[in-house]
Amino acid sequence: MGRASRLEPVLLSMDLRPLIPRGIYRVRYLDHRTYRAWGEDKLEIHFGVVDIGEAFETVLSRHYPVKCLGKCGAKGKFKPRTATSSLPVEFYQCHPDAPRITRLDRIPMSKWTDGIYNARVETVEKNFQQKPLPRQLQYSVIRELLGRADM
């Protein structure tokens, strides 16, 4: 019987991020954290690629603008900036049967653990100043979660 692998999202801000070909990949939730960058609060959700191939088990991130509630960090509490921002929209695209939330700080992150999701992966080719990055420094990110892959 095969041994289930355990992906460890130990990506530090100074580490080089993975680069895989752009496209649609099936991913699973690993964990999340909140952080502050350039004066803005963010939520970073780590996903692991489950498609067999060269990208298998690659850890990719999806970043959302949020407001941190309390201290930022691993499993930090947050709320999306608005009810129609990308986090609530993608949450309900991936969990269409989830009940309607009445407060933005009540998005159940535990729901992410119960499925496989389709993610559109793109390559970051420019830095924050919109200057081209050398190929060696380019990396992949999840631009959008498209919905459940296991339904």
Regions found by a protein language model. Give the residues of each.
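Short beta-rich binding modules
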Residues: 1-151
